[in-house]
Each structure stands twice: as C-alpha cells, then as structure tokens.
A protein has these predicted regions:
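Bacterial Sec-dependent N-terminal signal peptides
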Residues: 1-27
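Carbohydrate-active catalytic/glycan-binding domains of CAZyme proteins
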Residues: 21-333
C-alpha cells in the first residue's frame, strides 16, 4: 500500500517536472515529429476553420500541425491572472481545447503550490482545480472569464472536460482527487451558457472503486480496486450510447477503461466495462476526427526509460459507429 502511494505521488511529481520543463522551454521548433514531443495528456483539436491541428496537454503549451506528422511549437497560450487564486505561476495539467458557439475554450487543471488546503493521511494537498479560459482563436491567447472559481476551493479537482448533455445544457465533467477523497470520483457540474462559470453544485457520477479492472494492494497486501480517477472524456456511439473513457492504474501500470451510461445522459447509472480499452501503459485519452474524416484516439504512452518516466503522444485508430468504442491499431501519421 505504501509503495503504491509512493508511486502515485511520484507520478504527480513527474507531472510537475513535465510542466516546469515545458514552461522553461521557450525556444520554438519546426517540423518536429509527433513521437519526438514529450507531452502528458495530449489533446488534439482538428480545426476546420484554419485547416490545422492544435495539440495541448500538460505544461500550458500548444503545438500546431497541418498533417499530424510534423509539428511547430511550443507556443505559450494560457494567460492566467496572477492576482487570482492560481498565483503568478500555476502548474497547468491536462489542458483541452473545445470550440463552442464561435469561441474556443481551454479546460485545464491549475495548481497553486503556495496554497495548502488540507492534509490527509500525511499528504499535504495543494490548491488545485479545474478551470476554463477563453479565446477567439484556436491558438489563443486564452484568458480568464467572469467567475474566479468554478469548483470549491477546499476540494482538489482535476482533468475537467466538456460535454453538452441531452438537456442542451453545457457541463464540466471532472475528477475529485483521491488524495482527499481517498476513493477518487468523477463528477459533473453545470456550466453557465457562455461557460464563464458554474451553476449549482457538483454531482457524483461514479467512484474509482466501481472499476472491475483497476487494482492496487491494501494494507494487508490484498487486491482491491484502485483509488485513482484520471482523464475522463465523453463520446456518443453511432447507436446513441453515451460513453466515457477514463484512466486509473493496475498496480503500477497506467491503464484506461470505458464506462457507458444506461440512461444515455451524464446522470447514468454508469456501467463499467470489464476489461481495459487500450493496451498497458497507454492512457488519458481523447477522441478527435481528422480533417479528412478519420476518427482517432490521442493518448500518452507512459514508460520507464532508465528509471525516468517519459510520456509521449500516441494515436490509435478507433471505431464507435456501432454500439461500443472499439480501439484498433496504433496510427502512424
């Protein structure tokens, strides 16, 4: 149990190091192959207005490409308010780009390491929350909107994503972090019509422990479901089913699964598929359609290279034209 907790905390340290290194790396490069970019939580927007691909993730940077093969970047696109709760230099994790009603929105996790909100089982918890920035252009700059907070200040949240449900209302779907929750959750909260803030309170969708495939050891060395929820992303199949990919761990192996809503709405109930959806050490996925109409899944590969954990973007072919999401072979642009 202690080893698993240490491993997970090292994973958070890795995210911080990736974020810090990317923020320091200001030199812009051209014609960089996708597999030469070190990036956690890659999210790709295929923008038809500009006929370009825009990739973001952890670190607050953005990359551009015309063909998915060669990329230019990194560009610093997130312009936060130093006077806000985020502080002057927040860590930025798992950024996503979402076009909506003529604008582009930057959903990301921001952490102010100078502010401590809780201590649980010896773990000091920093001020961390999902938040939304806005821009008129896909390559930014992305700036704050009206509301200074989207989620409670005393609750660590992360990996917010965007979904418009059957009621026509926009929602943020996010993780309540296991460090405080102990059994991490995925929740939803309604957004204002212009996404400038939230309405009401968050609602539980499911808990990490509901997963039939994730695993960790308890204090007695016995197997139990893992406590981590990470990287939710929503989609609708060709038959109208609402699905969600999300990531956890099988012991020390980063693993992605999928759940489906029986009601076809965010309210669920959510039924977890028995087996993971992608191979071991691939996770934090999202789905996008290429400019020529092909559906792909963007993930990062989590691997150990001589004791250093490296995360690199990878693409998989996918098909969800039927009743379920089917993940095919690796796609090489």
């Amino acid at each position: 149990m202690k080893k698993i907790g240490l491993f997970l905390l090292l994973g958070f340290s890795l995210s911080w190091l990736v974020s810090a290194c990317q923020e320091r790396q200001q030199e812009r490069r051209k014609e960089v192959p996708l597999d030469s970019i070190v990036l956690s939580d890659p999210c790709i927007l295929a923008d038809r207005k500009t006929a370009m691909y825009y990739m973001t993730g952890t670190g607050g940077m953005l990359w551009k490409s015309k063909d998915l093969k060669l990329w230019e970047g990194p560009f610093h696109v997130a312009k936060t308010d130093s006077g806000s709760w985020m502080g002057p230099k927040p860590m930025i994790w798992a950024a996503e780009l979402h076009p909506y009603k003529g604008k582009y929105y930057y959903f990301a996790t921001f952490t102010n390491q100078a502010v401590k909100i809780d201590t649980v089982q010896g773990n000091v918890i920093e001020r961390r929350a999902s938040h939304v920035l806005v821009s008129d252009n896909p390559d930014g700059p992305y700036v704050p909107m009206k509301d200074s907070t989207y989620l409670p200040a005393d609750k660590p949240t992360l990996d917010g994503t965007f979904w418009v449900d059957k009621d026509g209302k926009p929602y943020m779907v996010y993780c309540y972090e296991w460090l405080q929750a102990l059994d991490g959750t995925i929740e939803k909260i309604e957004l204002k019509p212009d996404l400038s803030g939230t309405i009401g309170e968050g609602k539980l969708l499911f808990r990490a422990s509901e997963s039939p495939w994730s695993r960790e050891k308890d204090a007695d060395g016995k197997d139990k479901p893992n406590k981590v929820t990470d990287g939710p992303y929503l989609f609708r199949t060709g038959t109208g089913r609402l699905g969600m990919i999300w990531t956890s761990w099988i012991y020390n192996v980063y693993t992605q699964g999928v759940a489906y809503s029986e009601s076809g709405t965010l309210d669920g109930p959510w039924i977890q598929e028995k087996d993971p959806i992608t191979p071991p050490d691939f996770g934090h996925g999202m789905l996008f359609q290429t400019l020529d109409g092909k559906w792909l899944m963007s993930v990062h590969r989590h691997k150990d290279v001589n004791g250093r954990y490296i995360r690199i973007p990878r693409l998989f072919e996918v098909d969800f034209s039927g009743d379920k999401l089917m993940v095919g072979k690796l796609y090489i642009p």
